[in-house]
Curated annotation (Swiss-Prot):
Name used for this protein in its record: GDP-fucose protein O-fucosyltransferase 4
Ranges in the topological domain labelled Lumenal: 30-505
This enzyme's EC code(s): 2.4.1.221
Keyword Endoplasmic reticulum listed: yes
Organism annotation: Gallus gallus (Chicken)
Stored InterPro entries: Alpha-1_3-FUT_met, Glyco_tran_10_C, Glyco_tran_10_N, Glyco_trans_10, GT10-like_C_sf
Length: 505
């Protein structure tokens, strides 16, 4: 990856972008130059001060008893006999995700060892705080905790859309982290099937074809579109708008709205985003559901894909290029990108609409033993977390135990290295790589970038966001490399990158 690429030229001009940036840069520089609110760089301190911090940092560290009084539960198979005051600490930097209630600190007993977990940022510079856990949607390069301490790892939890933070789709951004839990199967703790409760969800009964045909005779279209989140990186509305020229598409959401839901209750968006029985029964009458994700990335698959399959509708899908790997059999979805144009897709949908026998082939996975994909079945069986399953941990608790076990292993390896006086090698750092997220540059939903007018809002928003995220990843990486302690200097680094880009172009 780099500063080039077809989308790079589509960024806003220097005046528009950097007027905004300069304001923030100036404000950040002034904050860095002043006394600040805890932005001073820690000094050498003394042996009794966590991480050698002094002054503001010493006051920010909780007293020892705060990490001794945490609740304790001895899980089966865990023989860790250490007291709380000897355990590694994991800090949920994104405190809203802290998966323990009530309180701010908890002891967790995982398969291979125990840790304390906390959401109190006062623990950030404690010598026993071994890992910081960040939520990808909330992570901002200009707010990252600096300086980055050498004894701490950074962990990323990001189950949501790539559009929430394109910083993570560039090598400088994703390589900031040591452990990852993302929708990609290549991540350390994959969450790929987070929207699929189990194989039984796919086997749910479909509405009889006769009822769907009766629905058609009442004037309803064969194709459903239900979206209220418009202007997204996948640019799905642009494609659907073109498709509508060739086949009837009933659109009930705010995007391309052309039909009203039959009741005020169903028109409530909160109902339309849940598996409400009335809502589900209504949309199950449609033969085809347009299932276009808001962003394109390998293994990013949401309820837009799985819900139609649960109901017995056929998804007309665009999203993960690798979606076939996860399908129950070889004929269960229709891929938009298999067709040369929306017109060709419309012809095929019309053919299936008029030929029930051919249409029903797409629902054969619902038959007894109809799920033929062993990779899918084994992946569901192998995952250690559950979806709406009280017998299994949720993926937040699972990921923190994943980190806990690896941090305990790292601590033991470091102790062994120190005890052997170098004869035993020090543990090598585990670094996330591009495939842990690695989502491509957004492209238009229909046509090419070159075909779009200069003032196209999608082009101005998403191409700029994608490439600015690369710059932000490079800026934060440089700050960490230079052991910066002032967040406000982020905009100085961004300015340097901007000047470098300007010289290159």
């Amino acid at each position: 990856m780099g500063g080039g690429g077809p989308g790079r030229a589509a960024r806003r001009g220097p005046t528009c972008l950097w007027v905004t940036l300069a304001l923030a840069w100036g404000a950040g520089s002034r904050a860095a130059a002043g006394d600040g609110d805890g932005d001073g760089e820690p000094g050498p301190g003394d042996a009794g001060t966590p991480c050698g911090a002094e002054g503001w940092a010493r006051a920010a560290v909780p007293p020892g008893p705060a990490f001794v009084a945490a609740a304790s539960y001895r899980g089966p198979g865990n023989n860790d006999t250490r007291s709380n005051k000897a355990l590694p600490i994991l800090l949920w930097w994104s405190g809203s995700l802290f998966p323990h209630f009530p309180g701010d600190t908890e002891r967790i007993d995982c398969p291979r060892g125990s840790c304390l977990v906390t959401r109190s940022r006062r623990a950030a510079r404690h010598r026993r705080t071994k890992a910081l856990i960040f939520y990808g949607t909330d992570f901002r390069a200009y707010e990252a905790p600096l300086p980055r301490l050498p004894h701490q790892t950074w962990a990323l939890f990001h189950e949501e859309s790539p559009m929430n933070n394109y910083l993570l789709s560039h090598p400088p951004g994703i390589r900031l982290f040591n452990y990852t839990a993302t929708f990609r199967r290549e991540s350390d703790y994959p969450l790929t099937l987070q929207w699929l409760p189990g194989a039984g969800y796919l086997r749910g009964p479909a509405l009889p074809l006769a009822e769907k045909d009766a629905w058609r005779r009442r004037g309803y279209g064969p194709v459903l579109y239900m979206q209220s989140h418009c202007d997204v990186p996948s640019d799905r509305d642009r494609y659907v708008r073109e498709l509508m020229k060739y086949i009837q598409v009933d659109s009930y959401g705010k995007c391309l709205h052309n039909r009203e839901l039959p009741s005020e209750r169903l028109r409530d968006t909160s109902t339309a985003t849940t598996e409400d029985p009335e809502f589900m029964a209504f949309i199950a009458r449609y033969k085809f559901h347009l299932a276009l994700e808001n962003a394109i990335c390998n293994d990013y698959m949401t309820e837009k894909l799985w819900r139609p399959m649960h109901l017995g509708a056929v998804p007309v899908y665009r999203g993960s290029p690798a979606v076939r790997d996860w399908m129950p059999n070889n004929l269960s979805i229709i891929l938009i990108d298999d067709f040369d144009s929306p017109q060709e897709l419309a012809k095929y949908l019309d053919f299936l609409d008029k030929n029930g026998e051919e249409y029903m082939k797409y629902l054969e996975y619902k038959n007894l033993d109809g799920i033929k994909n062993q990779f899918l079945l084994e992946s569901l069986e192998r995952r250690e977390w559950g979806v709406n399953d009280m017998t299994l941990p949720n993926y937040l608790n699972g990921f923190e135990c994943f980190i806990c076990d690896r941090e305990n292993a790292r601590v033991r390896a470091e102790q062994e290295h120190k005890k052997s006086r170098g004869k035993t090698p020090a543990p090598s750092p585990h670094i996330a790589h591009f495939q842990h997220m690695g989502c491509p540059m957004p492209t238009p939903g229909f046509g090419s970038v070159e075909d779009l007018p200069g003032e196209d809002s999608w082009k101005e928003m998403w191409l700029q966001d994608y490439w600015q995220s690369l710059d932000q990843g490079e800026a934060l990486t440089a700050m960490i490399r230079h052991n910066e302690s002032h967040q406000g200097r982020f905009w100085d680094y961004m300015h340097e990158i901007f000047l470098k880009r300007t010289r290159q172009h």
